[in-house]
């Protein structure tokens, strides 16, 4: 019986070998546990039209499963809203929470492949941090991910991606994500 050797994701290896040391020097942490890291990545795809046509949620679930490599959780409406013809319990979105190696591989694919494929991409807004080092940004369509076959897209679906870090301030989170290769706009 052969033992399959587990390889470390490329971005995780770079974080452990280079980025942690540079962040420690930059911010002068007294303890190695203070160095910020990525905790999880949440990918959310809201499908508001699913209230009218329940089949639309299946396309979002399939797209998210292909992009992230993990089965999405279907999000349901918490309360009824008559103006939107929405009833409590109707499916209105899909969400995936990535941790561990899957998270590192997704971030690597996002930064190295998906973001550069966006047309007229000028960089991510560096001001979209939440005050505690977490970063959220939106993508307008799913076609920039190479896992999705462009010909099989029935409709463009946007998504929100939240990168949750253990940083305590926005500056620490920004420095971490910039070191990981996130293309932020220069002011």
UniProtKB/Swiss-Prot annotation:
GO terms for biological process: translation. Keywords: Ribonucleoprotein, Ribosomal protein, RNA-binding, rRNA-binding, tRNA-binding. Belongs to the universal ribosomal protein uL5 family. The keyword RNA-binding applies. This is Large ribosomal subunit protein uL5. GO terms for cellular component: ribonucleoprotein complex; ribosome. One of its GO terms (molecular function) is tRNA binding. The keyword Glycoprotein does not apply. This is one of the proteins that bind and probably mediate the attachment of the 5S RNA into the large ribosomal subunit, where it forms part of the central protuberance. In the 70S ribosome it contacts protein S13 of the 30S subunit (bridge B1b), connecting the 2 subunits; this bridge is implicated in subunit movement. Contacts the P site tRNA; the 5S rRNA and some of its associated proteins might help stabilize positioning of ribosome-bound tRNAs. It comes from Mycobacterium sp. (strain KMS). InterPro entries: Ribosomal_uL5, Ribosomal_uL5_bac-type, Ribosomal_uL5_C, Ribosomal_uL5_dom_sf, Ribosomal_uL5_N. It comes from the Bacteria. Part of the 50S ribosomal subunit; part of the 5S rRNA/L5/L18/L25 subcomplex. Contacts the 5S rRNA and the P site tRNA. Forms a bridge to the 30S subunit in the 70S ribosome.
